[in-house]
Amino acid sequence: MVYPVVEAESRVGFGKGFARRARAAGKIPAVAYGLKRAPEHVLLPAAQMSLIMRRANALLQLKIDARESLVLIKQVQRDRIRNIIEHLDMLFVNEDDAVTIRVPLRFVGQSYAGTVTSVENYSVAVTLQVSQIPEALVVDVSGLQAGRRIFASDIALPDGALLVSPPRLLIAKVDPVRRATQEPPPD
């Protein structure tokens, strides 16, 4: 499989002041760890990472000093006010490794007329191979009637994937639309 390649610079400075200067220069401080390797502190290009981060559970080839390693973005720290990425934690992985991650759900279709679908959970935890990580799991609510519930165990998983979330975790429910009752005008 082909993954985006990101050129990373080794990070020599640490602390709040260094991180602020790096972000002002268009870089994101990050750390990559795992696979019994020493953690590597790096700086990543902010513009390129913003594009890659649009996809949940993004995988990328991290190029550090002419070495390439496959990494999974594990945690993102964001400044919600300025809408910037402040720091990334990444996990070194192999394509055949099994990882436990939260996969977002994408809801398609419309429930039966006169009903409304209420979404209770937007992701589920699964264990699967790195090479099989989907962008999202599809939940089809087409034609579901009032009273129907969708649980985590009802979601179709990729081959070889195991559900980690509780099987009875409520994902969505279909309820009848409540009609507004008109009260008689006061006398």
Curated annotation (Swiss-Prot):
Keyword set, alphabetical order = Ribonucleoprotein, Ribosomal protein, RNA-binding, rRNA-binding
Cross-referenced SUPFAM superfamilies, in alphabetical order?
A: Ribosomal protein L25-like
Which InterPro entries does the record match to this protein?
Answer: Rbsml_bL25/Gln-tRNA_synth_N, Ribosomal_bL25/Gln-tRNA_synth, Ribosomal_bL25_b-dom, Ribosomal_bL25_C, Ribosomal_bL25_long, Ribosomal_L25_dom, Ribosomal_uL5_bac-type
GO terms for biological process, alphabetical: translation
Molecular-function GO term, any one: 5S rRNA binding
Q: Which GO terms describe its cellular component?
A: cytosolic large ribosomal subunit
User: Key word Disulfide bond present in the record?
Assistant: no
Family statement drawn from the similarity comment of this UniProt entry = Belongs to the bacterial ribosomal protein bL25 family. CTC subfamily.
Assembly mode? Part of the 50S ribosomal subunit; part of the 5S rRNA/L5/L18/L25 subcomplex. Contacts the 5S rRNA. Binds to the 5S rRNA independently of L5 and L18.
Q: What does this protein do?
A: This is one of the proteins that binds to the 5S RNA in the ribosome where it forms part of the central protuberance.
PANTHER family reported for this sequence:
RIBOSOMAL PROTEIN L25/GLN-TRNA SYNTHETASE, ANTI-CODON-BINDING DOMAIN-CONTAINING PROTEIN, RIBOSOMAL PROTEIN L25_GLN-TRNA SYNTHETASE, ANTI-CODON-BINDING DOMAIN-CONTAINING PROTEIN
Q: What is this protein called?
A: Large ribosomal subunit protein bL25
What species does this protein belong to?
Answer: Tropheryma whipplei (strain TW08/27)
Q: What is the lineage of its organism?
A: Bacteria, Bacillati, Actinomycetota, Actinomycetes, Micrococcales
